[in-house]
A protein has these predicted regions:
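Charged, flexible cofactor/metal-binding loops and thiol motifs
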Residues: 107, 111-118, 122-126, 137, ...
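Generic, well-ordered alpha-helical scaffold segments in large soluble proteins
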Residues: 34, 38, 55-59, 83, ...
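Glycine-rich cofactor/substrate-binding loops
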Residues: 1-30, 88, 92, 273-392
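Short linear loop/turn motifs
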Residues: 51-54, 219-224, 381-386
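A structural signal for small-residue-enriched, beta-sheet-centric alpha/beta enzyme cores
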Residues: 102, 215-219, 357, 365
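A helix-coil-helix interface module used to build multimeric assemblies
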Residues: 1-195, 200-203, 266-269, 280-284
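Conserved hydrophobic residue
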Residues: 43-44, 258, 374
Length: 392
């Protein structure tokens, strides 16, 4: 059957390209795990298993895949089966598909890709956290002015400031680690919907593919969107925290505040104004984070009011879009780490703001309460009036 050229170009060819780029290795792993299970359960005779094994080994070494989907096949799955048929014959190649479907295969591949994304993000976050903690230890007594509602509020240490973001990230990493466990359930064996009459061993396939367990309900296995929506919600939270912190750093590096600055290798100048030093790395963090967040947030809308079935919203084109957003997110982390580690505190400016704004007087009011036994609210009014008169 010849497919529409428009549909073939816009949908099927892009699906094929995505499989070739991102999912070929997981696809090969699923084939091997499924064959091992078919052999161990004696669903396939030894002679057929041997023939398929030889074909898969040959397919593993295959190079020079067509850059575009061949017209005679619908997708990468059928291209792979057609190629395997050329190696070992149609009967043996077709036997590899006993007790499975593209439904359970595809969502298994997507989960394998997603768990790699999650694992890579967690590893990178741990590196970032270690760098921020080490940096904070070097600034345990470095003073910084902290703001509330855009106004100077209290003085603290730079380590305290960074530590707040470290704590936020640790919470998100913990939640994403839990999400990983949800993603790491194996759909294989669900087949199209209702499993199969063959005596398969779902746990064996799950184990071979590195999953913690099979997904018990086969309809959930091929219908759920949790493998995608749960992790991206945690990434949205993470990126939201990053952009808020970056915006706060941008405020502190403004000319009017001036307690943070960046070295020359992280600023850009104006094409006409010679005095300008723009810390644009902070803006690019916001841009990349915003682009990734936009994609992640779109997935909730994508699944809104869709049928709870095996549907293409739960498919590879969605995953392809996700992969691009993950790249933006990982680059956001690289830029954020660079901005954190290279930011410089201007202690004289911190002291100037502290003196002019009276941000140490909260402790003064508390000390009056402790030492003079004055009522707290009275002490508060005394100090407030003192600051007000001193600022005239």
């Amino acid at each position: 059957m010849k497919l529409s050229r428009i549909y073939d170009t816009i949908v099927l060819n892009r699906t094929y390209e995505h499989f070739l780029t991102h999912l070929r290795t997981p696809f090969d792993d699923v084939n091997k795990a499924h064959l091992v299970m078919l052999s161990e359960t004696r669903i396939l005779p030894e002679e057929t298993v041997k023939k398929i094994k030889e074909g898969l080994i040959r397919y593993d070494t295959l190079r020079g895949f067509p850059g575009r989907k061949p017209e005679e096949v619908e997708d990468y799955f059928f291209y792979a089966e057609k190629t395997l048929s050329e190696f070992i014959g149609e009967t043996a190649a077709g036997s590899l598909h006993i007790a499975r479907s593209r439904n359970d295969m595809d969502t298994t591949l997507f989960r394998m890709a997603m768990r790699e994304n999650i694992a890579a993000w967690i590893r990178r976050l741990i590196q970032l956290l270690e760098a921020m903690i080490a940096h904070g230890r070097r600034h345990l007594v470095t003073p910084i002015v902290l703001f509330t509602h855009g106004q100077p509020a209290q003085i603290s240490s730079y380590a305290h400031y960074l530590g707040a973001m470290v704590a936020e990230m640790l919470e998100t990493v913990t939640m994403q680690r839990q999400a990983y466990e949800s993603v790491n359930g194996c759909p294989m064996g669900a087949c199209a919907i209702t499993t199969t009459g063959f005596p398969i061993d779902r746990s064996r396939v799950a184990s071979l593919l590195g999953f913690s367990k099979p997904i018990a309900n086969s309809y959930q296995a091929i219908s759920t969107s949790h493998w995608l929506l749960v992790p991206v919600q945690h990434w949205i939270l993470f990126l939201n925290d990053v952009t808020r912190f970056v915006e706060d750093m941008l405020h502190k590096s403004s000319f009017e505040v001036g307690i943070l600055s960046y070295p020359d290798d992280l600023v850009q100048m104006s094409s006409i104004m010679p005095q300008k030093r723009n810390p644009v790395i902070l803006e690019h963090i916001r841009i990349k984070a915003g682009m990734a967040m936009g994609v992640f947030q779109s997935f909730a809308d994508l699944f809104h009011n869709t049928a709870y079935q095996d549907i293409n919203e739960n498919g590879d084109l969605t995953l392809d879009t996700l992969q691009k957003a993950v790249i933006e997110m990982m680059e956001t982390i690289d830029l954020f780490e660079e901005a954190i580690l290279k930011a410089r505190i201007h202690a004289p400016r911190v002291e100037e703001i502290a003196m002019r704004s009276g941000i140490t007087v909260t402790e003064l009011a508390d000390e009056i309460v402790r030492r003079e036994r004055v009522a707290f609210r009275d002490a508060h009014h005394i100090v407030s009036r003192y600051v007000s008169e001193g600022s005239r």
